[in-house]
Amino acid sequence: MRNLYLSVAVLVLATLSVSYQSCVSDVSANAVTPAKADPTEVIWHEIEDLANLQSKQQKPVIIDVYTNWCKWCKVMDEKTFSDSDLAEYLNDNFHMIKLDAETKSDITYADQTFSYIKSGRRGYHELALALCRGSLSYPSLVVLDEDNSILQVVRGYKDAAELRVLTVRS
């Protein structure tokens, strides 16, 4: 009887071991495979990465200055930036940057540190104010040349066709 229990225990342990190995290999197979960027979605970067991006490949830059509460910023994300043809065009021709105009983190850009300024109920980030040339309006798209000089600030909602026309002229 003791041998029977021992045999059953060994069989159960062997089965559990095989099942565990199968699960671990499935998980590690998924973990090793990096997700590739979908070329039909805009590839967004942080502004802190801009110098590194420009050192690898110089391109004009579009900075989407937004806030979390801005309805039209969300509509642009859902409709304009989700247009697959526009996304592919923007990814090919621009470094795309997202900047929350109310982020509370200090940001170092162009060897200068910018901070959050508490003002009223919300406040604003100094970098957003500087990029938007002193006039905050959401959404705002700031277009920079390859040397990161401001070419233009485009304020308000733009659909995919309008944005395509604006970026072709830049």
What name fits each language-model region?
Residues 1-31:
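Bacterial Sec-dependent N-terminal signal peptides
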Residues 23-41, 126:
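N-proximal helix/coil linker or "cap" segments that precede and/or mark the start of modular domains
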Residues 42-61:
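A short beta-strand-turn-helix
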Residues 46-49, 81-82, 127:
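N-terminal post-signal-peptidase region of extra-cytosolic proteins
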Residues 57-71, 96:
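Short active-site neighborhood of thiol/selenol oxidoreductases, capturing the structured segment around
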Residues 74-78:
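Detector for the c-type heme attachment site
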Residues 84-87, 91-152, 169:
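Thioredoxin-like thiol-disulfide oxidoreductase module
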Residues 157-159:
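A short acidic/small-residue loop/turn micro-motif
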